[in-house]
Amino acid sequence: MSTPAAGPVRQATGIDGTNIVYRVTGDPAARPLVLLHGWAQSSACWGDGLLADLSSRYRVVAVDLRGHGYSDAPEAGYDDSKVWAGDVAAVLDAENITAGAVLLGWSYGGLVICDYLATHGSAAIAGIVLVGAITSIGRGEAGGRVGKAMRAAIPGAMAEEPRIAIKALGSFGNALTGPVEGKGTEAQALFGLTLSTRPRVRAALFDRTVGHDELLRNLDIPAFVLHGTDDTVVDVSAGRHAADLIPGAGASYWDGVDHGPFVADPERFLGEVSEFVDGLDG
């Protein structure tokens, strides 16, 4: 099974036996770029066009996080940083990626990157990209500060009753794309991915507390923070917090852009991410 942009479907096994599905495309000899999506999304969120553009430059590995997309949705494990770290490590191991990889995380994917680095270190990683991302989670964690659309959606977004969930998630409006003309199709596709994620998984991802500030202060690889100033899902202050903590981090704050900069302006996104990735050593 495959799609033209996303590549063949492959599978790795996490430390608890969970099957993690991912797709690979691009030159096998190119630098690996591992894409980790956000809460209640899947690897489909990146869109065929952006995946095709990225895969013309890199070996793109687009992962479905546990509980999302085609990956297994176990009953437990969502509150354990080591389990999340193990999922990423399993994909890297399955692809024999031992050095030079770039991890790019959108939204909750940024937290998963930090989980991985906290457990496995940076030996296999050349750099990280945090896109509208959280790096910590829990009450009082500056790296996990959510925006007004996310606050409005909780707790209804976790409900099993469809009418409640749809109404709550509808409060996102255009948050994932921004009020960009002509993005209605993309907005509905992302909304569909959210609804297709099991309610118990939507809830479980918030049911943990972890702080990664110390990890970021001591990060020994380059990092690039990309965040919309009008992000209503993950407040821009969370991105600024990460950029301030990480030694030498680069940052790009997109004025007036909401939670999905790669949807709002894929060409600009491709350019900025490529500039960072192409400037890395190793």
Task: For each feature predicted by the language model, list its residue ranges.
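Conserved HGGG/HGGXW glycine-rich cap/lid loop of the alpha/beta-hydrolase fold
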Residues: 18-74
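Conserved alpha/beta-hydrolase "nucleophile elbow" surrounding the catalytic nucleophile
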Residues: 37-39, 105-110, 228
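Flexible "cap/lid" loop of the alpha/beta hydrolase fold
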Residues: 114-159
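Conserved alpha/beta-hydrolase catalytic His-Asp/Glu region
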Residues: 140-145, 159-218
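Short beta-strand/loop motif that positions the catalytic acidic residue
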Residues: 219, 225-227, 231
